[in-house]
Amino acid sequence: MKIELLGYLMMWGLVLGTARSTPLEVATVPWNSGEVRLNEIQLVGTHNSYHLEPEETLKTKFIEKSPLSRQYIKTLEYNHLPLNEQFDRGIRQIELDVFADPVGGRYAKPRGATANTQISARMNEPGLKVFHLQDVDFRSTCPTFLGCLQTVKRWSDANPNHLPILILVEAKDSQIPRWVEKALSFEFTQPIPFDEAQLDTIDLEIRSIFPEHQLITPDTVRGDAATLNQAVRTQGWPRLSTSRGKIMFALDNEGKIRDRYTRGYPSLAGRVMFVSAPPGSDEAAFFKRNNPFDRSISHLVSQGYLVRTRADADTREARSNNTKRRDAAFASGAQFVSTDYPVANPALSDYAVAFPGNVAARCNPFNTGGCPFDLPRDIAIR
């Protein structure tokens, strides 16, 4: 949320992304991947995986009102393919931003919409909505959380041997400062806070789509261990042989929203999502480390934790064709490397984030575990 507030100083929030447009080549696995554990591989994911850029007329409108917003507008200029098409091309980690809408219709008439804007009728239904920023950056390939989950479920059922898919969920409720509204002569729809009841809604909507046997939850990972942290440090993560065809969720938020989600659920017992908890705490299993240069990543990976990092941010790397951050992300050992550019945007540069040979996954370069040392690290895993 602090990053978003910095973004509001320019205009509004935080954003990234682009679309993949070419098929992913997947080779045959020449080794028994069933013995490999989930934390011993590395995959590429996408950030704001639902995103479609704002219409040109809306971008022009805000640039005219606030010329300083031009630079921020550039960070909104990306599009993602529908989730099922991303999965077809090898993406195994996505992120969905959700807004609470228990009555329905709160975001059905975006104030930045034009006469040509198409709004899904599902925006009038009660339930969580998926988009980036109310009234401005609201276009989405799956505007409701349930709709996104149904897309994931259909694809997973049709491809039951797929590697586990991690879905990051960010609960968004930041208020737009009044001074920003005045500067833009634009009144924003203020979001509903994510209290305990609204956080429970996330779990309820997930469980309404996915049966327990299709989920990797804190309970399944903890097993008989005293705490979730103890389980991942001693027993380890599930093997791929028992994890294929399954989905796991993690809460992107830290701070107050994370604490609200974990309160009353020691070691996340009964919860669906993992959280980025303090190292060593009972709930510690997954960590969000956006900065791939963060030296704590390799330390966390060596202790058995899952880590997600980012290869790029705010379109900077693609515009400058700078691969330093991407290369650091790959080398860090983080199991999930998130990008806005799983393929290059030729209008910007050749910058892209993919493994050699465009394989779907590879042995973790830091924590090899069950991956053999005598095979290339970029071998493909279906």
Locations of the language-model features?
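Bacterial N-terminal signal peptides that target proteins for export
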Residues: 1-6
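Bacterial N-terminal signal peptides
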Residues: 7-15
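Sec/Tat signal peptide C-region and signal peptidase I cleavage site
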Residues: 18-20
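Catalytic cores of phosphodiester-bond hydrolases, prominently lipid phosphodiesterases
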Residues: 22-382
